[in-house]
Amino acid sequence: MGYDETLYLKILRDTWGYSDFRGIQRDIIRSIAEGKDTLGLMPTGGGKSLTFQVPALAMEGVCIVITPLIALMKDQVENLRRRQVLAAAIYSGMSRQEIVKTLENCVLGNTKILYVSPERIGSELFQTKLAHIKVSFITIDEAHCISQWGYDFRPSYLHIADIRRLKPDAPILALTATATKDVIDDIQEQLEFKERNVFRMSFERKNLAYVVRTSDNKQQQLVHILNSINGSAIVYVRSRKLTKEICEFLLNNNISATYYHAGLEHTTKDERQRKWHDDEVRVMVATNAFGMGIDKPDVRVVIHITCPDSIEAYFQEAGRAGRDGKKAYAVLLYDKSDKAKLLKRIAQEFPNKEEICRVYEHIAYYLQIAAGSGYGRTFHFEVEKFSLLFHHYPVIVNSALKILSRAGYIEYDIDPDSRTRVKFTLERDQLYMLHETTPNEELVITTLLREYSGLFVDYHFIELAFIAHATGLTQQQVYLILTSLSQRRILHFIPERSVPLLTYTQDRVLPEEIVISESVYEERKTQFEKRIKSIIDYAQNDTVCRSRQLLRYFGETETNDCHQCDVCLTHQDTSQSYKDAYNQALKTIKALLADGEKHSITELNKIVLNQEAKDEAMEYLVNEEVIKVELNNIFLKK
């Protein structure tokens, strides 16, 4: 239908209350409205979501939004529904019945925006239903995940090309907050853009001051920073173990804190995230599992205790500070050992191919998979247990699993959504005839039957916290009751487990038959080495404005100094000190020569400490014909 400025502004005003678009929002919206494949590069807080939500309401059909961020899906669907927008989501953890119902609503035209996780789009059910859905356009959020050259490549994103073939007339809108030139080109190639079409918003964050602090005592520096800057904060660390240690350290120093990592139970993660978001807790200590899709605009400081593996990762995580446009800080703590640790990560991320083949062979022994079999089989796989049994380093095993996944031998899902599930094993009539249940057990059973449908037919995901609230019991009591009912075969209770899943995507081969191509190993290793070098250069730089250095990495060369990073402020201090020294040198030279006699430069050197300032002052006085220099002597010019 093309772009109608009046219509699109009316939707923006009536639904979101904004009077006009900002930045490159209008350009992106016009492009997608005209049916063009479009790549939008917008920094964190740049208003990405409106670039697909507004045209989704204006165009006929359903806008499909592919994103890996389940928390973001749920949050945006809830916000859109509050605005009377027909929105829905499909993600891992939903029952087949729920997915079918959601897709049927799309077929019937009862949905305008459908959020889908990349893992779901490859399913037969989704693709079958998609054929009957009128699609307006397809949005790919976090589009850098589709690029083999991106810092956060996700194999599941490669399924997106399947939708392109099923819906060839639906334009693609790809959005990302971090992309180098290689990644920009690769995104458009992977998504089969009909024509190159990129809109770039400057990644400059004028309210964000970038700081690197070199310190031998990072924990002491951390406390100093948090005591100096008020407001909400995120502290990023590299390991799950460190999240707890740093959190306890902050609590011992009277700083409100909690911690977050992928290994925590979903209910625990949700509760800690809520407390931090609602300012019940000030500091979130986390691994990089935290932050994507978290919409908290008033974070005043993001602190990295350990260096990320790339500028892209650092820029995205640091960018979570100051999304409200007010002054905020991004601080990287660096010490003498960090460079060696970063370089060591290269060998950890890319173990030699012989080691990778050994890990593959030992996995087969561990899971008891014979050569020539295993295709399609899925197993719970705990890296720590496996590593201990076969004498491997866990970090090497994790890297080998990623490389074997890229090479096509396995799929490895490190954080599957294995939430708590329940299914009744007794028929409904048998359930009503039970006589050996306690009042609390009857209360839990009644609540399950009232709040969840289809429990006699299939497993259903449940929330222990919700049942506890509905029954007036504690979560621990609900857990023990469900365990007891399961042991007595009244129902089947599967507690939440955050155990990674390993799937054989082809039959097991012998180690000598494994082929790991250059594109999977050598080329990616070279890219990783470049990213490591870039983050080291950033941390060790003390001459170039940090904002300029970051923007230059993303291809923005025509930028100015920020005048607020530690490098700029140091230069300003140095500049003022030099200016003072120069003025003092002028006064000293004039005072020395006031007697009208010749004086030696050696004599002058003894009383002017800053030699650079002295030389510049002498040059100025000579050019102004105030003094004259002959050999080693200076005197006033008559």
Residue ranges and their predicted role:
Residues G2-T15, S19-G23, D27-S49, A56-G61, ...:
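Helicase motor core with emphasis on the C-terminal RecA-like subdomain
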Residues I64:
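ABC nucleotide-binding domain signature
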Residues I172, K637-K638:
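Solvent-exposed hydroxyl-ligand-binding patches built from regularly spaced Ser/Thr
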Residues A209, F635-L636:
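General beta-strand recognition
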Residues T268, L636-K637:
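Generic cytosolic/nucleocytoplasmic N-terminal low-complexity/intrinsically disordered segments
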Residues V281, V299, C307-Q316, G322-F635:
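C-terminal accessory region of SF2 helicases/translocases
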